[in-house]
Amino acid sequence: MSDKIIHLTDDSFDTDVLKADGAILVDFWAEWCGPCKMIAPILDEIADEYQGKLTVAKLNIDQNPGTAPKYGIRGIPTLLLFKNGEVAATKVGALSKGQLKEFLDANLA
């Protein structure tokens, strides 16, 4: 796992995401979720490739049940792109690296 990925908790979400400057991609995931495990290596690569433009963060919804309902998370993996503390874009489900890069490039422009 990339050392560039931030591991969030319900307690740290406010500071690490909502009060942070710039763009942050938050992956809402769980240990038992197969598609979540499929995109984990892709997120590691994205964290490296987009360093300086984007911060990648992960929130385990089983260990941190308070945050996901605030954002209407119903299925996982769900990726929320935050810009300066506001949700700028959402993607639900596993994506290929190409699809994720298209999503990010379109929303970071």
Curated annotation (Swiss-Prot):
One of its GO terms (biological process) is cell redox homeostasis. The record marks 27 as: Deprotonates C-terminal active site Cys. Residues 2-109 form the Thioredoxin domain. Participates in various redox reactions through the reversible oxidation of its active center dithiol to a disulfide and catalyzes dithiol-disulfide exchange reactions. Monomer. Interacts with bacteriophage T3 DNA polymerase. Belongs to the thioredoxin family. This is Thioredoxin 1. The gene is trxA.
